């Protein structure tokens, strides 16, 4: 199928599930900042007037979890009159955290394939499959639909925080549909933005008048600024633009829907454009390959595309709990590769060390929270873990690796 419409969505930091992801990763940042060897699997639940922290943590760090939770909720924007019914200062915060199972800890600390190589000593924290993807549709080598959906969500949050549109509240979602012809993006078919707002705007309470006001404001202050540097731009006469299609969006955030860590895994990755292994990222320390190996798979895929060895690349990795080396490595280039997929796999095995300890070392994952002032993983917990133009993410820095791949591939050309 060469002609089609593909759609991806994003959500703002005030979405209930994203509140949870940010809290879980804020806990991770705090623990790793004090104790880089912390083992963390932190899950968060939010509902009307309630936040629950649960999971398994083994760490020497001392963290005031209740204070941390309230600060994250406050920074997102749920405080006082702008809280939309969920307030950082008054919500109940419950903490129910246990230690990591000694059976799991044993497998991670002493890998089944242990030998004299220190990086073989750390086994994978669980079994699982992870996918990484890259394509040449955008400068950051991400699919255009998810890239544009994130741009809109980021800009929507920005105009709220800066009070450019002072009637906006924290919860919101974006969705973008792109027209493809012969497999290439050619135009923006539809943009959908759902955003929480006050029940009254400048004295206006009529539902349709409010919706029209929001629509006009969002086109001017969100859509245009978010897309002004793109080659493919929305056209006000051709691009379908939908805003709050149900009519109004006053009740939102945890007051409107319960939230849970790990429920936006497609938003976190490639917007459905590539396959997903099923594992979430937030609240998990780097020994959890759901997170670290997914970052490594993106690193590999992006390096391949950056080296111009393929226009599209999807990499699958699989692991067994307590075993350091990947069980399997698979690369798919969708008939866009300049060398065979078997040759690409050889290059991957030669140039990328995909054992958990090696990934952690390559990306400095244990020490980045402290290096970044206690806030690293939390910043990835909204607006995507890949292709971020606003963050310095080590798995996105592929220039050096891509150059080596390009040089090494010459023997196959």
Swiss-Prot record:
Give the enzyme's EC designation: 2.5.1.6
Q: Which GO terms describe its molecular function?
A: ATP binding; magnesium ion binding; methionine adenosyltransferase activity
Q: Which UniProt keywords apply?
A: ATP-binding, Cytoplasm, Magnesium, Metal-binding, Nucleotide-binding, One-carbon metabolism, Potassium, Transferase
The residues listed in the UniProt record as binding Mg(2+), with positions renumbered to this chain, are 17
Tell me which residues bind ATP.
15, 171-173, 248-249, 257, 263-264, 280, 284
Instruction: Paste the cofactor note.
Output: Binds 2 divalent ions per subunit.
Location within or outside the cell? Cytoplasm
Region described as Flexible loop: spans on this chain: 100-110
Bridged cysteine pairs (disulfide): none
CC cofactor: Mg(2+); K(+)
Q: What is its main location?
A: cytoplasm
Can you tell me which residues bind L-methionine?
Answer: 56, 100, 257, 288
Gene Ontology BP term (one): one-carbon metabolic process
The record's family statement is: Belongs to the AdoMet synthase family.
Subunit architecture: Homotetramer; dimer of dimers.
Q: What is this protein called?
A: S-adenosylmethionine synthase
Corresponding gene?
Answer: metK
